[in-house]
Swiss-Prot record:
InterPro entries: G_OBG (IPR031167), GTP-bd (IPR006073), GTP-bd_Obg/CgtA (IPR014100), GTP-bd_prot_GTP1/OBG_C_sf (IPR036346), GTP1-OBG_CS (IPR006074), GTP1_OBG_dom (IPR006169), GTP1_OBG_dom_sf (IPR036726), OBG_GTPase (IPR045086). It is found in: Cytoplasm. Belongs to the TRAFAC class OBG-HflX-like GTPase superfamily. OBG GTPase family. This is GTPase Obg. One of its GO terms (cellular component) is cytoplasm. PROSITE patterns: G_OBG, GTP1_OBG, OBG, OCT. It holds the Pfam family MMR_HSR1. It comes from Alkaliphilus oremlandii (strain OhILAs). An essential GTPase which binds GTP, GDP and possibly (p)ppGpp with moderate affinity, with high nucleotide exchange rates and a fairly low GTP hydrolysis rate. Plays a role in control of the cell cycle, stress response, ribosome biogenesis and in those bacteria that undergo differentiation, in morphogenesis control. The gene is obg. One of its GO terms (molecular function) is GTPase activity. Residues 159-330 form the OBG-type G domain. Monomer.
Length: 430
């Protein structure tokens, strides 16, 4: 089955904690602090793999974590950085942030890669906190947590050629005949619910990827039927084969069908309607198809659209159709290559930023308890040794400098009131 959406949870590596250590070499009785910094947490990186065609792997594993950084060591030795986790995705994958729907990355090129979740910074060792009044600091800073987020992966199908047309016009039959793909085929609407891919090899040895894209009906641009799913898959094909039932077996006019589908493409995205098209006039082996075929040719030839009479059931006319499509693809690829050579090169860089300030915190009151929360508060709590006077002094200094004490006063705190910061509770005294 072709999977084109997946939701996964990402957790980048935590930074290693800074070390509390002291020089203990012989003949150095008061060597001072020597705690090294923690290593950086591993990033989570998405990288294009041209050999992949689906998001199937992400269906079975939903949680991904990068390696944590190592803690700092004695003798001012840094901890080792955590190893990055590289996740391979097919070309054409879009990464969205689940809550906002914001596009984080659009991975199309063969060498595209992007850091989606950044590892936390390593904490500072106690050697950073030595001063004229603090000769032997007994505290260090904990490493930062890595970024955590849930993302939705969406694969915009990358096929060279897409088969479009109303349900039951013979797209699935055509795909099964010209490729080794085995789509479900039956005589009812929306038999094809997900795209089927196949590789076409012409009699001249050329090849291209062909996709039988789920059928659509009027109102598809508004989401009717399989509309939005269908239209999303069309976007990145280079060329469309518009399959029409010229026998009119369901009582429809093939020319009207052609106009209706192109109208849906235009309403969804004007660029879709501008894609090069070739018409495969299917079911010409059925009596009565000839009149519709001549009418179709007369109208579309004036618009410069090639019409190929075929029968997917008997393989009539398929060689001519596929040879033309292969030739047209080469022309389009040459045009794209020329544009790429002349266009200014632009380096794609994505950096996932925190939505809130690094030192953001909140003060709330529940009954007689003042609760202070924030990422920097949590990190400060984790890195404070409350049994050490120097560490406690540094803790109080940070709260004062970052405005926490002022905010508590604004909230109405009084002498002796209880303050809670995660796992720590203490009474407030000015």
């Amino acid at each position: 089955m072709f999977i084109d959406k997946a939701k996964i949870y990402l957790k980048a590596g935590k930074g290693g904690d800074g070390a509390v250590a002291f020089r203990r070499e012989i003949y150095v009785p008061a060597g001072g602090p020597a705690g090294g910094d923690g290593g950086k947490g591993g990033n989570i990186i998405f990288q294009v793999d041209e050999g992949m065609r689906t998001l199937m792997d992400f269906r079975y594993q939903k949680h991904y974590s990068a390696e944590n950084g190592e803690d700092g060591k004695n003798r001012n030795m840094y901890g080792k950085d955590g190893t990055d986790l590289v996740l391979k995705v097919p070309p054409g994958t879009i990464v969205r942030e689940e809550n906002t729907g914001e596009i984080i990355a659009d991975l199309t090129g063969s060498e595209d890669q992007v850091v989606v979740a950044r590892g936390g910074k390593g904490g500072k060792g106690n050697s950073h906190f030595k001063s004229s009044v603090r000769q032997a600091p007994r505290f260090a800073i904990a490493g930062e947590r890595g970024q955590e987020l849930t993302v939705v992966l969406e694969l915009k199908l990358i096929a060279d050629v897409g088969l479009v047309g109303f349900p039951n016009v013979g797209k699935s039959t055509l795909l099964s005949v010209v490729t080794s793909a085995k789509p479900k085929i039956a005589n009812y609407h929306f038999t094809t619910l997900t795209p089927n891919l196949g590789v076409v090899r012409t009699k001249f040895g050329d090849s291209f990827v062909l996709a039988d894209i789920p059928g659509l009906i009027e109102g598809a641009h508004e989401g009717t039927g399989l509309g939005h799913e269908f239209l999303r898959h069309v976007e990145r094909t280079k060329l469309l084969i518009h399959v029409l039932d010229v026998a009119g077996l369901e009582g429809r006019d093939p020319l009207e069908d052609f106009e209706k589908i192109n109208q849906e493409l235009h309403l969804y995205n004007e660029k879709l309607a501008e894609k090069p098209q070739v018409v495969a006039a299917n079911k010409t082996d059925i009596p009565g198809a000839e009149d519709n075929l001549e009418k179709l040719k007369a109208v579309l030839s004036e618009r410069g659209i090639e019409v190929f009479p075929i029968s997917a059931a008997t393989s009539q006319g398929l060689d001519e159709l596929l040879s033309y499509v292969s030739k047209r693809l080469k022309e389009l690829e040459e045009i794209e290559a020329l544009k790429a050579d002349t266009a200014p090169k632009e380096e794609k860089v994505y950096k996932y930023e925190e939505t809130e300030d690094k030192y953001h915190f909140t003060v709330t009151r529940e009954n007689d308890v003042y609760i202070v929360e924030g990422r920097f508060i949590e990190r400060l709590i984790n890195s404070t040794n409350f049994d050490d006077i120097d560490s406690l002094s540094y803790f109080q200094k940070v709260l004062r400098n970052r405005g926490v004490i002022d905010r508590l006063k604004e909230a109405g705190i009084s002498e002796g009131d209880l303050v809670k910061m995660y796992s720590v509770e203490f009474e407030y005294f000015n």
